[in-house]
């Protein structure tokens, strides 16, 4: 098995296969032990490699992970971006090759500066710290791409109890640490004290996760809210067709009018497919309907801001009418879907760079939350719910979470189910109920433990009825966010860096 840790194609191909295991640990497959196996194979494959070989080993791992785990991007480019099969394949390969460097560069850094082959415990801790740093970096760099985090595999796994303590980040850290420790255990057997400490580090977090699973970190802030969520199941090719606007508005109105004994009526992202000011009469009428029901209606709608120079800016928004108030403008935009980077160069080249409603501006930071039925509601539009720190900042001010989305862009791929899993993790991290309304699925209600308690199947028109309980109190993660864990990771990485620079006789302090 030494070939695994040697330069060359056999090890690279194994890294490719190991990376491709990543999505199998996540929704919709949920074979969570594969997350540990995948990372363990990468860790083993990097052992002893020089920097350049480690860089390519990490790149092949990343290519496998993103190639398999974000294959739904091809659906968006080909099916809805009108790109030919060769062009869509080329763009998908280019994207995958680029994001694979998220793993390549840390692998190079690991080999050149941090790896300590003669200190199995310290090496495992430093590797887990580097893995956490990688996931944090991915959530920030170039607006972020926080997809395929290892920690999502533990949504309902043994580590779920740790998620309210340290978020998905803590789950990822423990998985990476466990993977490295399992690889290094045989090297610890001759050393009793080190073996004992290694077993504590390996088993302790899993035992703590099981012990805390189901612990109630938050409590009720009032009576349950009766919720109706509408899933319109509008085909994407009809979504922005001007001839279909009236039919869509009528559909959501007609599905909502009969609803009685309701507090919140929720429509999906851009359920109103025209600008808010153009739909003012319609929204005003629906607000009156909501008032008559003693309810609030919350819907996605694009928003126009007229500027003093005669130009306008456009936002992806959510607004409340009836017994509530507020309009929220989306802050985390999807590249190419909601805005086009370098648009002066790319606009007009292919249809994918000219999708409908792909010229949104970013909403301002520090917007007030939505208000409905006397409660503060944290809003997330589509992609925003996948950012743990961003979501936590809003959740800490709220009693209920709300996310609206249109995952029609991803067809029947695994993308919408991965997206749903990340939304569930936000509910678990915050200890709050979440309402999720989507155009074609999955619309559902999620409890504070990340469990779906009501849902409408994908690709069906439907009406979901249920209750959510406003919650108060802060989980440890909402209180302290990722900072304690990031600080620990920083100390571990500095420890590894210093330990590597010392002479052999001085390394015992850092071993």
From Swiss-Prot:
Main subcellular location: membrane
Entry keywords, A to Z: Acyltransferase, Cell inner membrane, Cell membrane, Membrane, Transferase, Transmembrane, Transmembrane helix
Subcellular location, record wording: Cell inner membrane
Residue positions of the active site: 269, 330, 382
Classification via InterPro entries: Apolipo_AcylTrfase, C-N_Hydrolase, C-N_Hydrolase_sf, LNT_N
CN hydrolase domain segment(s): 230-470
Keyword hit for Acyltransferase: yes
Gene Ontology MF terms: N-acyltransferase activity
Entry GO terms, CC: plasma membrane
CDD domains, A to Z: ALP_N-acyl_transferase
TM annotation in the entry: 7-29, 58-78, 90-110, 125-145, 163-183, 192-212, 482-502
PROSITE patterns given in the database record: CN_HYDROLASE
EC number(s) stated in the UniProt entry for this protein: 2.3.1.269
Family annotation (SUPFAM superfamilies): Carbon-nitrogen hydrolase
HAMAP family attached to this UniProt entry: Lnt (MF_01148)
Job description of the protein: Catalyzes the phospholipid dependent N-acylation of the N-terminal cysteine of apolipoprotein, the last step in lipoprotein maturation.
Protein name: Apolipoprotein N-acyltransferase
């Amino acid at each position: 098995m030494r070939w695994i840790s040697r330069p060359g194609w056999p090890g690279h191909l194994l890294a490719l296969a190991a990376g491709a295991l990543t999505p199998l640990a996540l929704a919709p497959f949920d074979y969570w032990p594969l997350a540990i196996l995948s990372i363990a194979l990468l860790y083993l494959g990097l052992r002893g490699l020089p920097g350049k070989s480690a860089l390519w080993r990490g790149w092949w791992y990343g290519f496998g992970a993103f190639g398999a785990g974000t294959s739904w991007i091809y659906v968006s480019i080909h099916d809805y971006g009108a790109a030919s099969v060769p062009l869509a394949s080329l763009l998908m390969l280019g994207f995958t090759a680029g994001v694979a460097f998220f793993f390549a560069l840390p692998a190079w850094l690991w080999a050149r500066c941090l790896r300590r082959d003669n200190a199995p415990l310290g090496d495992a801790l430093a590797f887990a710290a580097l893995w956490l740093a990688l996931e944090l970096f991915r959530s920030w760099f170039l607006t972020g791409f926080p997809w395929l985090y290892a920690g999502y595999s533990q949504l309902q796994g043994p580590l779920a109890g740790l998620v309210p303590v340290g978020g998905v980040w803590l789950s990822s850290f423990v998985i990476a640490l466990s993977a490295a420790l399992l690889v290094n255990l045989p090297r610890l057997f001759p050393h009793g004290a080190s073996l004992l400490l290694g077993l504590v580090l390996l088993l302790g977090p899993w035992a703590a996760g099981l012990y805390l699973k189901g612990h109630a970190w938050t409590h009720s802030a009032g009576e349950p809210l009766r919720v109706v969520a509408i899933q319109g199941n509008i085909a994407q090719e009809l979504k922005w067709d001007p001839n279909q606007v009236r039919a869509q508005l009528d559909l959501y109105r007609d599905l909502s009018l009969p609803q009685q004994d309701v507090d919140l009526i929720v429509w999906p992202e851009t359920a109103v497919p025209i600008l808010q000011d153009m739909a003012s009469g319609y929204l005003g009428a629906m607000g009156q309907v909501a008032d008559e029901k003693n309810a609030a209606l919350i819907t996605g709608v694009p928003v126009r801001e007229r500027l003093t120079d005669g130009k306008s800016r456009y936002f992806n928004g959510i607004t409340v009418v009836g017994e509530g108030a507020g309009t929220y403008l989306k802050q985390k935009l999807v590249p190419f879907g909601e805005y086009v980077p370098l648009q002066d160069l790319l606009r007009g080249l292919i249809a994918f760079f000219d999708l409908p409603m792909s010229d949104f501006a970013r909403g301002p930071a520090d917007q007030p939350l939505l208000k409905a039925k006397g409660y503060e509601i944290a809003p997330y539009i589509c992609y925003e719910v996948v950012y743990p720190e961003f979501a936590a900042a809003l959740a800490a001010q709220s009693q209920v979470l709300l996310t609206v989305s249109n995952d029609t862009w991803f067809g029947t791929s695994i993308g919408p189910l991965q997206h749903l899993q990340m939304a569930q993790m936000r509910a678990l991290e915050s200890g709050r109920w979440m309402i999720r309304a989507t155009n074609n699925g999955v619309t559902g209600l999620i409890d504070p433990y990340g469990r779906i308690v009501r849902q409408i199947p994908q690709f069906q028109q439907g009406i979901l009825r249920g209750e959510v309980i406003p919650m108060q109190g802060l989980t440890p993660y909402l209180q302290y966010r990722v900072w304690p864990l990031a600080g620990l990771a920083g100390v571990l990485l500095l420890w590894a860096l210093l330990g590597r620079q010392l002479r052999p006789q001085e390394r015992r302090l850092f071993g």
